[in-house]
């Protein structure tokens, strides 16, 4: 949304799960273990990136000082963690034997939930910044007029309560986003990537 006509600078930061934050999986697993289980995992192969609260704060603050407007900053979080491995390790660290004393139950992916997180789309160009753990991606930028046209179309579809058209318009605006485990996967076939 960074528009040359505007004095407002928009900077985006992308990162994975923040350890210890509200909704984080670790406190959720701790409660389930304390209650005697089972520990619930949505899929045996699901993976997620993790970072600490100080790392997340540092990314946001550094991005604010580095950004000129329109950039997307991504924190290097290392390798993603398999959530099943995390559940097993937390059970062991709590003094229990996984699957014997505390069971792990696979409950299935929630609608729209992905097996892996995409921090950057494939077309994004990643550049190193002066901070060794922060990269900058320069995605395709739309002019404000194009964005306004999309917003008008999306608002009109929303007023008609046409969820499918809302999602279709959003996919036209952000064609790199592909649905997974969603009723809108069929719309991905019709979306053309802008060049």
Which residues does each predicted region cover?
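Strand-loop microenvironment adjacent to phosphate/nucleotide-handling motifs in alpha/beta enzyme folds
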Residues: 1-195
């Amino acid at each position: 949304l960074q528009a040359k006509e505007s004095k407002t600078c928009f900077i985006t930061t992308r990162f994975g799960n923040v350890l210890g934050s509200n909704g984080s999986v670790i406190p959720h697993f701790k409660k389930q273990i304390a209650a005697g289980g089972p520990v619930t995992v949505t899929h045996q192969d699901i993976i997620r990136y993790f970072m600490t609260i100080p790392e997340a704060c540092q990314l946001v603050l550094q991005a604010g000082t580095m950004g000129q407007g329109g950039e997307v900053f991504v924190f290097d979080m290392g390798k993603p963690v398999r959530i099943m491995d995390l559940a097993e390790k937390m059970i062991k660290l709590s003094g229990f034997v996984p699957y014997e004393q505390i069971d792990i139950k696979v409950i299935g992916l929630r609608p729209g939930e992905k097996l892996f997180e995409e921090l950057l789309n494939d077309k994004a160009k990643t550049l190193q910044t002066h901070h060794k753990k922060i990269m900058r991606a320069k995605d395709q930028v739309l002019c404000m007029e194009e964005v306004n046209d999309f917003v008008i179309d999306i608002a009109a579809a929303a007023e008609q309560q046409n969820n499918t058209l809302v999602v279709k318009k959003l996919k036209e605006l952000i064609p790199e986003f592909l649905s997974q485990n969603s009723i809108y996967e069929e719309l991905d076939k019709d979306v053309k990537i802008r060049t």
